[in-house]
């Protein structure tokens, strides 16, 4: 089939292209001829596009036809695939609100024979036609055109004329998207061919001035903007491609076209993938069955600036700039507001453009020619920055397209690195099913829970569950929807109201919204990890997600206004939203239009979101991947900028040295084939591709449904889960090459090498991670610069230091991982899975699951949602599960909730807002009593325990001291570079050669870079980690030790961390005790009697099994401690174990005095007291309740103990059942009360008191009741007036509000795992360096979030230990104080080492500058001499200081008692922790300046003595060099004279120096000469004098150089 008017287009195409060519350079003539040859084969494919481009270009150049003859212009074909055609209506209907006449156009078109379907897409301005399969397209489209033209003529007579409309989006179906990169790639091939041919045939190359002129135009943003205003984007791209290719070919430069060819190839593959997705999704997106979005005219700021009239119609608000097509061509554009903000690449491009112009001007002013100026321009080309960004975006775009995502605007992927705010619209979080948000019963038999479960069943099309005995049947139930009135009726809120009607009677009301999408949790977790501010616009049902975001806005907030304000206040915005039938679409589409990156989910039943940049599928999985690309895009762009900066620096240095060196270089030079700029660009391109590939290889997020299983009837839960079990989660597939290599490694020949090769591979991987150190790029550039100027030894030194540092760090990482693996090794958990027989109905299947006796033992890892598991004490729950059967079931959830007491579980549904969720079992909890059957609802990362951990799974690990050193380097590096520049400038003033001057300057600059900093940081942390490990603290992440030295807030989990998670009897209180009397000791006779009776009522262990309940164990243990033997006076007859429904345990027995049998009861006071008799009921009951309340306020769990005579027959204890006991348990005699509490660790209170005394803020976080939490806090040493906040107070708070609350709170009670993360994050936002100490799975996420995560070993959860940076391996929490002291010590060591490294280098720079000024124009020390100085003064002395402890612990005295030794240790810890906070700021700068001044003074004095005494210049330089070393070594000795290692290192370095200086051959190699007695006397005098000044007059030095004297640490 053919599309009309696509034949013979060559002449028109060439004419349009010629207009563009005339606007560019004449040097592109060859490329134009190439385009003419290519025109014919691509014409049929590209003609509709090229025709529009030609018209646009003609208007831009002042030629072409007037646009005001729409009734004589055929509507152009914008896209076709043979059967579906898009006709552009813009030229035909040039008046506003034309979309209101869509029906007038559609009806006549549909009646044309051969047209199967036809409709107008108003947002696109297109007539979309689907042809019959057998229709002749030429004939049909001809008739369509005739009909449309006639209709347009009629409508034009009545419509108000205005400027034409344009398409509001970048058309992925546009063939130009492929034609443009294809054309540019062909031009690059031609340029490559020309360059290689010219070099092979030795044709003369034109001056590089031509290439520089092309680069200047191509990389000057202002020039590009000017061309775009005249030629349009397409014309500008063509013109620049031609000029660049022609210039590269004529100058025989291979690198530029080769790199551009690679980049164009990526763009071509991206465009092809986008077009493929467009072809697949267009029938569904542009379907006539979908509702049309409202079209609103807007004023575009870009249209006002363009020469041709340009208007924009889109779903937006008046006066809002949106997408624009300049001049009506297919330039496709981007909203000008979107392009107005700059990311790292755009900012650098601007500065590089200005810098290259300044460099070129400087070259001309310095007497250089045009070639030198051209070289300066080419050295400043930011090619690497562009390449990295384009490579990342193109690779990511192709991957998204391959996954089926439609990218309407590829420019959005280029803006990912700019995003500062992520706005998530609650409409995008809407699931597929309706959900009950609130249920209210108003009739007997219809409580809230019953209304909820019946309504939920109706919404899901299920049969309502059978009623309980006290509930009414739901026969004939239906929902009657009630329209909302007033402001709450805003559709965007997503809330509707309905009445539940049964047999015509309204029995309750419900608020109905939508379920939350299963990918909502992964989406919010990923957004949290992007580093951008996350904002959530709520819809009904998303309120529980507030804690995961930075700010929230209520339902009904205008999305357009919100996005606009955030863009203005905080920067570029990425918006994730969706258009739904019951949501306001105009506001959503408008917000998508102005968002910098608009991502919209596609709802096939709603309007197509054409204003989005990216249209995903119907779920959030693709949006999760896009969000995960944000930090990677930012990192890739920053890396590209750094590469560009390094390439420019090296290219400029190469330019200077080459111009000063030989001119006889071969045509194949680094400058032409492999220049630093091109090398950096190639590296950036590869890095961009690799970074994007990592994003695309990320596994798909795991759905985490938030269904309220606890509120549903078991039958409903079983029907939704059973029979539809999900497949097991599998790891991402292993690549074929990796699998083949793995198979090959098991062969007989290679199997012996498998283990060592694996170790080497792991070491290589760990070493590669260490190369990510922030100082690595700086040192790499320095090494390359040294090599360029001929200082190969310095280059090798720097490279060697980098390698040694990375290997050392890698080894430590592997050691830590191995130790952690050994510590955390676990056995595979086994669980009994119930085999459910196949039966007909859901109810019968549920009954079979509840009563089936056959089970199979399987691995917990193989469980899936829908499996039924069987559990009994003391097993651990392997997954989240809904209880189906509960027999006296009690569960220990302390590792999850922090609640130290067991909780009762039951089968009945609980209220949807009930935080206890008593019908659920959660992974990690332990069964302490009873038996359970439960159906699995979530496994793996979908469980509640793992959900909190995964929320911070990828939180950036503390950068350690490296980050602080990077800040220091950023301050010092400019000074060292300035020193190198000063040496070069002074040398030139003294008429030194350019090459020599530059070499001296580079040598100084490189030598002044503290290349030992990374190694110092690594080894100091390693040494501190080893010292801590010896004290019982395993350091898994050495980088966090630096944060230990700065910690000012420590958060403690209570249960299992500060306590042993084991109940003990605190007191036994007789009933006669007054409420406020001091608690008696259990050894008191009256208290012992109460404890004895409580023990008699406790269930005794049987058959060697453990105690059934933790309370029984605690009471029996306490009772046995008072009696060395069993209570022989009590003969047990029968017992009734505790059951939650009864609330007490009972026992029947006979005492030794032969009295009648007694019934002993022990249970909750609210169950026991009503059964007791009192002489004065009113007063006695008030007294009892007051006493119970007083005990509870002490943080105790209170049990009441009572007794009475048993008057029944006891000959057959089988007849003594629970019902008989319950009937007899009246008129009881109240004996007293038992108070139980969790057992505190012996080291807890001393630790808390020491931390508080040292000025640390201690925060207690627990799942206990607020009253219990307050009491425990006081017992542990916190203030009695400490504020206690309930976890419910945190619900709904955004990040800012939570930070404000957390600033002055010391105790948090009843908190969930997610809220623990919220608390830690809030403290961090308050500027506090936070540590988190915990032992449970509920602590793991907070441990990972904290600056320092500390796990407590022992009974604790492996999840907590696995998330921790430091693991305490024994029960002594006092090791934490040692860790804090070690952190301080490491900081002090690093500070002194940095003083040696940086301060010594500063002194070297100052000495070199002085020597250059007063010498012969050359630096007094050369490259090799500076190498010697760095080796002797920087590396080994600095390392010895870094690995030794600053604070000496008090020595052991054989005459000291243990108490005296502990007191001395505590005093030492207090002195260290109460000192000033370690800092690398003012105190360090003072020490650096002092050392630099003293070093320079000593070296300069010795050098001056050498000049004033007879001798050669080499002797003088040697004296200065020697004093330079000895002055620094003397200061090092003074810093740590108590350390044998430092003393030995300093003396050893001095000995090596003397040996090198005095050995003739070696001395000459280093540019020195042996010194005589007079020279040595001068050196010693200078060294001693300078050192004496630093010791005797430090304050004078501070004042002389403007450094404020601060308190010494």
Swiss-Prot record:
Q: Which UniProt keywords apply?
A: ATP-binding, Cell membrane, Magnesium, Membrane, Metal-binding, Nucleotide-binding, Phosphoprotein, Translocase, Transmembrane, Transmembrane helix
Residue segments, region Disordered: 1447-1476
Q: Which reaction equation describes what this protein catalyses?
A: ATP + H2O = ADP + phosphate + H(+)
GO cellular component terms, semicolon-separated:
intracellular membrane-bounded organelle; plasma membrane
Q: How does it sit in the membrane?
A: Multi-pass membrane protein
Signal peptide extent: none
Return the InterPro entries for the record.
ATPase_P-typ_cation-transptr_C, ATPase_P-typ_cyto_dom_N, ATPase_P-typ_P_site, ATPase_P-typ_TM_dom_sf, ATPase_P-typ_transduc_dom_A_sf, HAD-like_sf, HAD_sf, P_typ_ATPase
Transmembrane stretches in the record are 30-50, 176-196, 238-258, 357-377, 641-661, 673-693, 778-798, 921-941, 969-989, 997-1017, 1396-1416, 1426-1446, 1542-1562, 1573-1593
Q: Which GO terms describe its molecular function?
A: ATP binding; ATP hydrolysis activity; metal ion binding; P-type calcium transporter activity
Q: Which residues are recorded as binding Mg(2+)? A: 1335, 1339
Enzyme Commission code(s) on record: 7.2.2.-
Comp. bias (Acidic residues): 1449-1462
Among Gene3D superfamilies, the record links this protein to: Calcium-transporting ATPase, cytoplasmic domain N, Calcium-transporting ATPase, cytoplasmic transduction domain A, Calcium-transporting ATPase, transmembrane domain, HAD superfamily/HAD-like
The record's subcellular location field reads: Cell membrane
| Family according to the record | Belongs to the cation transport ATPase (P-type) (TC 3.A.3) family.
NCBIfam families the UniProt entry points to: ATPase_P-type
PANTHER family per record: CATION TRANSPORTING ATPASE, CATION-TRANSPORTING ATPASE I-RELATED
Q: What is this protein called?
A: Probable cation-transporting ATPase I
The opening ranks of the lineage are: Bacteria, Bacillati, Actinomycetota, Actinomycetes, Mycobacteriales
